[in-house]
Curated annotation (Swiss-Prot):
Membrane topology, record value: Peripheral membrane protein
Taxonomy, superkingdom: Bacteria
Gene encoding the protein: atpA
Protein known as: ATP synthase subunit alpha
InterPro entries, sorted: ATP_synth_asu-like_sf (IPR023366), ATP_synth_asu_C (IPR000793), ATP_synth_asu_C_sf (IPR038376), ATP_synth_F1_a_nt-bd_dom (IPR033732), ATP_synth_F1_asu (IPR005294), ATPase_F1/V1/A1_a/bsu_N (IPR004100), ATPase_F1/V1/A1_a/bsu_N_sf (IPR036121), ATPase_F1/V1/A1_a/bsu_nucl-bd (IPR000194)
UniProt GO molecular function: ADP binding; ATP binding; proton-transporting ATP synthase activity, rotational mechanism
Organism annotation: Lactococcus lactis subsp. lactis (strain IL1403) (Streptococcus lactis)
CDD domains per record: ATP-synt_F1_alpha_C (cd18113), ATP-synt_F1_alpha_N (cd18116), F1-ATPase_alpha_CD (cd01132)
GO CC annotation terms, alphabetical: plasma membrane; proton-transporting ATP synthase complex
Positions contributing to ATP binding: 169-176
Family: Belongs to the ATPase alpha/beta chains family.
Length: 500
């Protein structure tokens, strides 16, 4: 068979015309150091701050330090399998995390990967972990209450949807319990909750998840966990991952509660990373931008304007103090960023006052705007009464001769302290909170022995549920008090049926 040169040349030309180059251009570098969750790489001249990079073993990292000769990278995964001399390449992307309804009821790590053994997750939607907070014109004043179900909080330091309220106190003073109770109380309130556990023991997180599951709260809750055994980079990004998940719901007109437990451990993880990356240390060896670390996170919580759907994201950050020192560096930083703080005190906790809220040091900068009308009426003077009681109580230790007015104030104060106590994982509906506070402030408890106050409360709720449910419904529906004469009459009717 004769070979025709023109046929061969036309075939070659056709092949050349149809050729599509199947190659990828990537800027690569070489790892010069790795250890303790960070790596340094030479050769990534065009890397951007916050850009994701990929190591040769598939582990991702984030560019943090852009130095003249090399790039400081935080490793988002197992850094033990990375070796000096390995290649690392730029991806041209920033870090994103899976978001969406599919995450509800799941426990995930800060990279959005499930750690609960309930199968793979693929939501089909992602959001950047670091995002710009809503601007001034995109926000609206906080006006709707977020009921925590805890009398001491809803009456004294009310929280509104879209607020940032710091929970601060020593270890083992019930900070996590306050947040878990607040999550439990959101059942049926059209609220999605995100619990971010930062640097907690894995056994502790498991206990919290089991509590939420047992009490039906995982139906509207996402748990993000970066446990104490994980590398510092994961502890550092965990709160931002939780905020990104919350923003997805907020920008779709929904209401979200995000609990950051706790930001002290995130600050310590960030300090560790910064020192390893050789950034200049400042006060207490924290880097200069440790304030910005928390402000850019907490500013993402907002009540959006009606034009943007009116959604909200409420933040409950935790800070752990040492020996009750709320003037420490990180504590004062976060106090100045948030819209109020709830201070949990050691002495109160160990004397049996739980939740151990110190009314004098706790404040909500939103205040009455985050309370229903009925609660405003019954709790108006409660805070001042409690503060003056504490003062009088301290004063009476030095003398016993008291006039009747002082004695009456002390008696009312002791009953107030009892009323504000609450058992664990038993959040109370707002109408019942209003009822017991009304009974307290209108003197119906003055003749009840202090030790019997909680028993009186339980029996009164049962009596009202059985005989005066319509009065409770008035509070639920109108958000206002029913006629005072009717309430007084009902409480007296209850007292007549008991020994009080």
């Amino acid at each position: 068979m004769a070979i025709k040169a023109n046929e061969i040349s036309s075939l070659i030309k056709k092949q050349i015309e149809n050729f599509t180059p199947d190659f990828e251009v990537a800027e690569t570098g070489v790892v010069t150091y790795v250890g303790d969750g960070i790596a340094r790489a030479y050769g990534l001249e065009n890397a951007m701050s916050g850009e994701l990079v990929e190591f040769s073993n598939g582990v991702l990292g984030m560019a943090q330090n852009l130095d003249a000769t090399d790039v400081g990278i935080i490793v988002l995964g197992d850094f033990l399998s990375i070796r000096e001399g390995d290649t690392v390449k730029r991806t041209g992307k920033i870090m994103e995390i899976q978001v969406g309804e599919e995450l509800i009821g799941r426990v995930v790590n800060p990279l959005g990967q499930p750690v609960d053994g309930l199968g793979e997750l693929n939501t089909g939607k992602t959001r950047p972990v670091e995002a710009k907070a809503p601007g001034v014109m995109q926000r609206k004043s906080v006006s709707e209450p977020l009921q925590t179900g805890l009398k001491a909080i809803d009456a004294l330091v009310p929280i509104g949807r879209g607020q940032r309220e710091l929970i601060i106190g020593d270890r083992q003073t019930g900070k996590t319990s306050v947040a878990i109770d607040a999550i439990l109380n959101q059942k049926g309130q059209d609220m999605i909750c995100i619990y971010v556990a930062i640097g907690q023991k894995e056994s502790t997180v498991r206990t919290q998840v089991e509590t939420l599951r047992k009490l039906g709260a995982m139906d509207y809750t996402i748990v993000v966990t970066a446990s104490a055994s994980q590398p510092s980079p994961l502890l550092y990004i965990a709160p931002y991952a939780g905020a990104a998940m919350g923003e997805e719901f907020m920008y779709n007109g929904k209401h979200v509660l995000v609990v950051y437990d706790d930001l002290s451990k995130q600050a310590v993880a960030y300090r560790e990373l910064s020192l390893l990356l050789r950034r200049p240390p400042g006060r207490e060896a924290y880097p200069g931008d440790v304030f910005y670390l928390h402000s850019r996170l907490l500013e993402r919580a907002a009540k959006l304007s009606d034009d943007l759907g009116g959604g909200s994201m409420t933040a409950l950050p935790f800070i752990e103090t040492q020996a009750g020192d709320i003037s420490a560096y990180i504590a004062t930083n976060v106090i100045s960023i948030t819209d109020g703080q709830i201070f949990l005190e050691n002495d109160l906790f160990y004397s049996g006052v739980r939740p151990a809220i110190d009314a004098g040091s706790s404040v909500s900068r939103v205040g009455g705007a985050a309370q229903i009308k009925a609660m405003k009426k019954v709790a108006g003077t409660l805070r001042l009464d409690l503060a003056s009681f504490r003062e009088l109580e301290a004063f009476t230790q030095f003398g016993s001769d008291l006039d009747e007015a002082t004695q009456a104030k002390l008696n009312r104060g002791r009953r107030t302290v009892e009323v504000l106590k609450q058992p664990l994982h038993k959040p109370l509906a707002v109408e019942k909170q209003v009822l017991i506070l009304y009974a307290l402030t209108h003197g119906h408890l003055d003749d009840v022995p202090v030790d019997d106050v909680l028993d009186f409360e339980t029996k009164m709720f049962d009596f009202f549920d059985a005989n005066y449910a319509e009065l409770l419904n008035v509070i639920t529906e109108t958000k206002d008090l029913p006629e005072e004469a009717k309430l007084d009459e009902a409480i007296k009717a209850f007292k007549n049926t008991t020994n009080y």
